[in-house]
Structure formats: C-alpha cells, structure tokens
C-alpha cells in the first residue's frame, strides 16, 4: 500500500471528523460535534497555529495527525506539539502512523522547528512501539489542571 501524507484540505472534513471521533473514543472521551467543528475551523484558518495532516491510500484518508506550532522558551524557533494521531483500525500496522510522523520530522527539519514532541498513555504499548522508532521517552511527568 502506497501512503501519501499531505496537509488536510476542506474536502477532508467528513473523514477527518470520523477519525477524530475515533481518536476521542480511544481516549474514552465522547465525540463532541461542537469541539470537532471548532477544531476543524482552526485547522483551516491560516492565522491559527493549529494544523492537520492526513494519510491517504488509494484515494481514501486512513489516518490523521493534528499538531500545534508554538513559541518555546528553550528554543530560538517554534516547537511542534503533536496533539492527536489516529489511524483507521483496519489500516494499522501498515506504516501509516510512521508515515505521518515521518512527514512531521521532515517539516521540522525543513522549517527549523526546535523540536517535535508528543505524549501518550504509559500503557498504550502499540503506539509506544511506533514512537520508540523515533525517540525514547523521557522521564517527565505531565500535570494537568482543568478549568471546572
């Protein structure tokens, strides 16, 4: 299977939403139409640093990655946070996730981002097997305070 990775386009919205909903369900969050619509609008807005790429095979979108570029206090150039990566379950173990990350690594080198980073659950062993091909995890612990 030949996988092509490219920036998301308006025509990808329906399939992006299906895959983003799958991502939300995987992390035990119910899909939220308002959140999906808001995120999609931000992805398409060139003034907002939220972006998405899609992996396509045989004309069908089979994977997505959403990322955010931001300034960083420990770098002279922007950092890239890979917020969401999801591959259609029927298409897994075929190099799709790797192709999405490869695309981001190439962009990092081309655009001079100071780093590309992401996180996953400690017990997401399948994803960690992929991520370990790119880098080893570090010893940082994440803390999150949510607005109530």
Per-region residue spans from a language model:
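Residue-level recognition of the GNAT/N-acetyltransferase active site
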Residues: 70, 88, 121
């Amino acid at each position: 299977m030949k996988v092509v990775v490219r920036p998301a386009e308006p025509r990808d919205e329906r399939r992006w939403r299906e895959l983003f909903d799958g991502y939300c369900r995987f992390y035990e969050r119910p899909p939220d139409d308002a959140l999906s619509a808001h995120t999609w609008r931000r992805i398409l807005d060139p003034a907002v640093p939220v972006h998405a790429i899609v992996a396509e095979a045989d004309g069908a979108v089979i994977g997505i990655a959403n990322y955010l570029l931001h300034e960083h206090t420990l770098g002279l150039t922007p950092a890239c946070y890979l917020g969401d990566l999801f591959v259609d379950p029927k298409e897994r173990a075929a190099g799709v996730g790797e192709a999405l990350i490869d695309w981001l690594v190439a962009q990092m080198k081309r655009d001079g981002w100071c780093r590309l980073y992401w996180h996953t659950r400690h017990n997401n062993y399948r994803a960690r097997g992929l991520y370990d091909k790119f880098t080893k995890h570090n010893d940082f612990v994440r803390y999150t305070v949510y607005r109530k």
